[in-house]
Amino acid sequence: MGYNVAVVGATGNVGREMLGILAERSFPADEIVALASRRSQGVDVSYGERTLRVKALEHHDFSGTDICLMSAGSAVSKEYSPRIAAAGAVVIDNSSAWRYDSDVPLIVPEVNADAAAGFRKRGIIANPNCSTAQLVVALKPLHDRARIKRVVVATYQSVSGAGKEAMDELFTQTKAVFQIDEITANKFPKRIAFNLIPQIDVFMEDGYTREEWKMVVETKKILDPKIKLTATCVRVPVFISHCEAVSIEFERPITADEARELLRNAPGCLVIDSREPGGYVTPYEAAGEDATYISRIRDDATVENGLSMWIVSDNLRKGAALNAIQIAECLVNRKLITAKRKAA
């Protein structure tokens, strides 16, 4: 028996990726329902070779739903996720609404799949921030070997992390530069075309942005609360894939060669690291791929036990949609949920 799956936010960047990945990975679904706001009702979206007609979220009956993949933002999730869970579905939420709730597991399957069983408290599992997801996938095998003390990370985050309107703004502004037209910034605080913006999300009282705060708190919750982390998050004029320049200090000795071998054998990781021109991965190459790519692995001579590296991943896939579906697969494969209903 397959599962009845609802995708909420099916017309957005991540929602569309979710539908595509469900089909790609042949997720055992008897029924897939595409849901969005009332203004998107009737829009067609792709699910593999099939076309689904989007239905309105507010009118949907979730009593027959087993798994709900939620990607409609925090406000919608806060309103609907508890209702959907109360109807008997497991909600896997991509927003930040539930990540910091102690009763809601925050899951990256390659890192802390065992914690997924905690969904029974609220009926909700949280997906981490896109930048956190790829970071902890790479950190996990290194932490297991040498115990991480401190991480310093600078992110280079693509505009798709801010939604379709942000991608449209980069395209429009880039075209305007070449046509010598006026450039208007709407989605970002400054123009993004041919520029970098060292602000993602709002500023907090201590000078960090909320995006930077998310990376700190989420890494601690997923991997180890003892890890110290500081982040600088930057928006860059790239459509898809996030990059991270990471320096790590360990409690125990570990060499670049040892790290390279560990990462080559770690789930979800793909090492591309040749010390020659082009011997690394860029955001262009990672787009559309599932792996977390690690390059530029090297010893950091500024600390006793240190490494530096370059991490790249498709933020719409591992950073969002793929991770959510891997969580659903984890629930199924570990028999944490049972398909109790057949599609009507």
Map each language-model feature to its residues.
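Helix-loop-beta segment of a Rossmann-like dinucleotide-binding subdomain
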Residues: F119-A126, N195-D206, M309-I311
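Short acidic/glycine-rich loop or secondary-structure boundary segments that cap or lie
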Residues: G161-K164, M204-G207, V238-H242, A256-D257
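Oxyanion-binding "anion nests"
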Residues: I192-F239
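C-terminal active-site/capping subdomain that shapes the small-molecule cofactor and substrate pocket
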Residues: I227-A344
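A glycine-rich, Thr/Ser-enriched phosphate-binding loop motif common to dinucleotide/cofactor-binding enzymes
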Residues: G123-Q134, G207-V216, K221, G319-N323
